[in-house]
């Protein structure tokens, strides 16, 4: 999956061994954790002008790539409560064709290069690309690195469940 704009050029390949090289070391670290807990190999490369554009467009492109790789019938829902040292973060996902994101975390902007706005842009982009509802809620913690990493790991775990093949369409309507 490729997304090219005047602000970014991003390639996401799911199921391919390789590196995650976005030229943003924090995002690389978070995406590596996400991929591990998702249980999928992925290769990601990116160039960008602003970090805001990078985090948002990576989310969109990753969501589109995940959507493209969904089985015909899939579990749809996934949840995780992810601890990381002082942090405890709840993540809930519904791949429902209804994009929405709620990111409720309390971190100090610019602590170690982390910003709430970047996490929110990534999650909103992921929700749009995957066409999913995503909720992330910080239950405890103060360290920005731990909170954001717990969120990315939790997203991976929740999506690992939500994207698993199912025997039926997981909707009382019969269609998502």
Swiss-Prot record:
Pfam families: IGPD (PF00475). InterPro entries: IGPD_sf (IPR038494), ImidazoleglycerolP_deHydtase (IPR000807), ImidazoleglycerP_deHydtase_CS (IPR020565), Ribosomal_Su5_D2-typ_SF (IPR020568). One of its GO terms (molecular function) is imidazoleglycerol-phosphate dehydratase activity. Disulfide bonds: none annotated. Keywords: Amino-acid biosynthesis, Cytoplasm, Histidine biosynthesis, Lyase. It catalyses: D-erythro-1-(imidazol-4-yl)glycerol 3-phosphate = 3-(imidazol-4-yl)-2-oxopropyl phosphate + H2O. GO terms for cellular component: cytoplasm. GO terms for biological process: L-histidine biosynthetic process. Pathway: Amino-acid biosynthesis; L-histidine biosynthesis; L-histidine from 5-phospho-alpha-D-ribose 1-diphosphate: step 6/9. It is found in: Cytoplasm. Its EC number is 4.2.1.19. Belongs to the imidazoleglycerol-phosphate dehydratase family. NCBIfam families: PRK00951.2-4 (NF002114). This is Imidazoleglycerol-phosphate dehydratase. It comes from Pyrococcus furiosus (strain ATCC 43587 / DSM 3638 / JCM 8422 / Vc1). The lineage of its organism: Archaea, Methanobacteriati, Methanobacteriota, Thermococci, Thermococcales. The gene is hisB.
């Amino acid at each position: 999956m490729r997304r090219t704009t005047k602000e970014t050029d991003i390639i996401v390949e799911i199921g391919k061994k390789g590196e995650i090289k976005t030229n943003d070391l924090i995002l690389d670290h978070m995406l590596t954790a996400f991929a591990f807990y998702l249980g999928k190999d992925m290769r990601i490369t990116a160039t960008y002008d602003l970090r805001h554009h990078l985090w948002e467009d990576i989310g969109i492109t990753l969501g589109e790539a995940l959507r493209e790789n969904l089985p015909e019938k899939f579990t749809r829902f996934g949840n995780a409560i992810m601890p990381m040292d002082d942090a405890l973060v709840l993540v809930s996902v519904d791949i429902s064709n209804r994009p929405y994101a709620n990111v409720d975390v309390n971190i100090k902007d610019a602590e170690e290069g982390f910003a709430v706005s970047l996490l929110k842009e990534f999650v909103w982009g992921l929700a749009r690309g995957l066409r999913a509802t995503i909720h992330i809620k910080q239950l405890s913690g103060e360290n920005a690195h731990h909170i954001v990493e717990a969120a990315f790991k939790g997203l991976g775990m929740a999506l690992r469940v939500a994207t698993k093949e199912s025997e039926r369409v997981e909707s009382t309507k019969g269609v998502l």
